[in-house]
Swiss-Prot record:
Domain of life of the organism encoding this protein: Bacteria
InterPro entries: Ribosomal_bS20 (IPR002583), Ribosomal_bS20_sf (IPR036510)
Comp. bias (Basic and acidic residues): 12-21
Official protein name in the record: Small ribosomal subunit protein bS20
Region (Disordered): 1-21
Organism the protein comes from: Staphylococcus epidermidis (strain ATCC 35984 / DSM 28319 / BCRC 17069 / CCUG 31568 / BM 3577 / RP62A)
Length: 83
């Protein structure tokens, strides 16, 4: 456990940032899964879900939650599955 005041604060901010990042990453994964299932079942709202999933992947990439190459790979797989 840190003794210095700034280190104590840093631990707190790191924990909150970690929770935020995990939440955003989970939301991205859920959006991608929903888009995949909508594409495979040929649902009516698959285009809307696909756009939302791509938006979530881009946001995760911009905030360095996932690498940009991985984001491109995910988007490419979704788009090719939608054809």
């Amino acid at each position: 456990m840190p003794n210095i005041k700034s280190a104590i604060k840093r631990v707190r901010t790191t924990e909150t940032a970690e929770e935020r990042n995990i939440s955003k990453k989970n939301a991205m994964r859920t959006a991608v899964k929903r888009a995949k299932t909508a594409i495979s079942t040929d649902a009516e709202n698959k285009d809307e879900l696909l756009r939302f999933a791509i938006k979530q992947v881009d946001k995760a990439s911009q905030s360095n939650l996932i690498h940009s190459n991985k984001a491109d790979r995910i988007k490419s797989k979704l788009m090719s599955a939608n054809k």
